[in-house]
Every structure is written in C-alpha cells, then in structure tokens.
C-alpha cells in the first residue's frame, strides 16, 4: 500500500454532515496545492436495502469506492460520472451529494466529493485501474472496504439512501445576460452575454449526470437559452411557462406555487430554469413547509439547486454555485 493511502486514514478532514450540502465557486478555499477528485457510492436494487459496488484496484491492492481526479475543464458532477463510467463501465444517475473528504497526498491535499449514484445500465469489465467489482450489501461493504474513511462515506450514503427522494428538481438560475440598463427593448428578450452562453454550455456536463427527463423554463429568453443546449443534448423540448418566472411569483404567488408542485408531482427528475427572485423565495417556502431548514439560500446566475422530495415534501437540497470548471 502506498504512503498516501495510509495517510488517508491517519490524517483527514470530513464534510459529510447534513441533508443540505453545497459546492461553492472555490471548492478548495483555504487549501494550498489542492488535487480535486470526485466519486460515488454506487448502488442498485432497493434504496432501503441496496447492493453497493466496491472496486478492487490492483495498483494499490485495496478495496475502495470508485473515484478519480478531475481533468482541466471539468466540473465535479461531470468528473464523478466520467470516472464511474471509466472504472466500472456503468451508466449511473447521480443523486444526493454526500459531502467531501480531504487528506494529504505527497505534499498536496486531495479533496474528494462523493455522491450516491444509482446504476441504470452497463456492464463491468476488468481494466488497468480496476480488476474486480463486487456487489455486496451495506454491512458486507463496511467489512470489505480497506479504508475507514471510505466506511464513513458509505455510512453517510446509507443514511441518505434510507430516504431516497421520489422526485428531484434541478432548479437553475439563468446564465449571465446583457445589462438591463443598456437594454432598451422588451426585458424578456434580453439575451445571454458571452459568459452566460458559456455557463449554458457547461451546465450540460454538470446536469447530464442527474439524467433529467423534462425541462421547463420561465418566459424570458435568457432562461430558455440557458437550458436549450442541455435540452439539445438530451433530445428534449423546453416547455416555457410564465408561471415559473419572477412576475408570476410577485403577481400570482399561489398559482406559481401550484405550478411548481405540479412538476414535483410528476416524479423523476425535472429541470426548471428561472430567475433570481422566484428561486430563493420558492425554496424558502418549500423549506418552511417541509422538513429541511435552510437558513441561507444563495442564487447566483448560472447556479443550480438540486432539490429532493418525498411525497411532495422537501427533504434534501444541494447547491452548486457554478458549472464553470473547477480548474
């Protein structure tokens, strides 16, 4: 076993607490010489009693959770999905952000973010990095894993899977648009600027791993244009409805709330792209009427909230402040 893997259990830091997690603009804030990585607790079957996939890495002689380093130009959900596919051959749907761990690796600090990831398809084939994958129950997985730190991640994932949401809403604020003060026409027609168009393109790799089935947008063009690249990649239409926008929230709040809950009732995974007033207000309303207190509700342009619901009640919330590359 290499020295840096020994350090993983001897010296580490964890952020694995809570049904509300977030990834900020600078995920390694305060860390010098960070190495970014992402992975997942791979699961299949019944979320209440799942089998989990544990990999064997011949180069380390260990049993661990699938993960890998981030390449330049990637965001963290995108690298988690890619690494799982490369190491295991499986297509997955990312779910709850379990949190992050960090530990020293040869003069640097390795930071690893983990999600739950449900297997949708594919087949494992031994490769240079992973020569065996075992599907085992949670208790057996704890015994099989080489590192205590991985066991801690697994236990947190087990807790989250014990109440796996039946619905997820990916609530996106539109990308950056041209300045309102320099726009003389209809504000609904104000377009994305260069950065906003880049945000829209990068939202593809951040959002695809969650496998959305429907895409909705508020009326302004900047909302629709933010999710059109994603819709094109998925082969989905963008359903535009003014009830998802700021004006509807201000003028017809109950109707806007009912429309949002209509999407929740559809189940599965949906994307809604909206604006900077309605998103935090809606989340505050959901929090007040659910089981998940959220004190601070940021809503940067190009950001996304992944909201989990059980029987129409908000139970989990993860905030991704930016789809732009981490490095």
Question: Model-derived features: where do they sit?
Answer:
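Acidic, metal-coordinating catalytic segment for phosphate/diphosphate chemistry
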Residues: 2-39
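Nudix hydrolase/Nudix homology domain
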Residues: 2-4, 61-62, 124-179, 183, ...
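Short, well-ordered beta-strand micro-motif
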Residues: 42, 56, 114-118, 135, ...
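Conserved Nudix-box catalytic region and its N-terminal flanking loop in Nudix hydrolases
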Residues: 48-91, 183-190, 195
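Active-site-proximal alpha-helix that buttresses catalytic centers in soluble enzyme cores
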Residues: 68-70, 79, 166-251, 280, ...
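Unchanged
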Residues: 70-93, 101-152
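A short coil-to-beta-strand element that immediately follows conserved catalytic motifs
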Residues: 91-99, 237-241
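Active-site-adjacent alpha-helix immediately C-terminal to a catalytic or transition-state-stabilizing loop
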Residues: 257-314
């Amino acid at each position: 076993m290499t020295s840096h893997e020994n350090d993983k259990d001897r010296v580490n830091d964890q952020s694995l607490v809570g049904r509300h997690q977030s990834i900020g603009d600078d995920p390694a804030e305060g860390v010098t010489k960070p190495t970014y990585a992402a992975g997942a607790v791979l699961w299949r079957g019944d979320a209440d009693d799942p089998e989990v996939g544990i990999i064997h890495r011949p180069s380390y002689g260990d049993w661990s959770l699938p993960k890998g380093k981030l390449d330049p130009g990637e965001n963290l959900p995108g690298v988690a999905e890619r690494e799982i596919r490369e190491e295991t051959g499986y297509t997955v749907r990312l779910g709850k952000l379990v949190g992050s761990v960090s530990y020293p690796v040869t003069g640097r600090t390795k930071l690893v973010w983990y999600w739950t990831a449900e297997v949708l398809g594919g087949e494992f084939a031994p490769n240079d990095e992973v020569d065996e994958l075992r599907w085992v129950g949670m208790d057996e997985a704890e015994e099989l894993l080489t590192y205590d730190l991985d066991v801690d991640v697994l236990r947190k994932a087990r807790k989250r899977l014990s109440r796996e949401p039946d619905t997820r809403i990916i609530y996106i604020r539109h990308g950056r648009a041209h300045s309102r003060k320099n726009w003389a026409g209809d504000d609904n027609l104000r377009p994305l600027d260069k950065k906003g168009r880049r945000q829209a393109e990068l939202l593809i790799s951040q959002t695809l791993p969650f496998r959305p089935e429907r895409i909705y947008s508020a009326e302004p063009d900047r909302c629709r244009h933010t999710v059109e690249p994603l819709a094109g990649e998925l082969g989905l239409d963008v359903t535009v409805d003014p009830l998802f926008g700021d004006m509807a929230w201000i003028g017809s709040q109950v109707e806007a709330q009912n429309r949002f809950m209509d999407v929740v009732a559809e189940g599965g995974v949906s994307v809604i792209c909206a604006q900077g007033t309605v998103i935090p207000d809606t989340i505050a309303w959901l929090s007040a009427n659910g089981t998940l207190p959220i004190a601070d509700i940021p809503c940067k342009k190009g950001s996304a909230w992944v909201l989990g619901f059980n029987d129409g009640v908000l139970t989990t919330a993860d905030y991704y402040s930016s789809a732009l590359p981490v490095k």
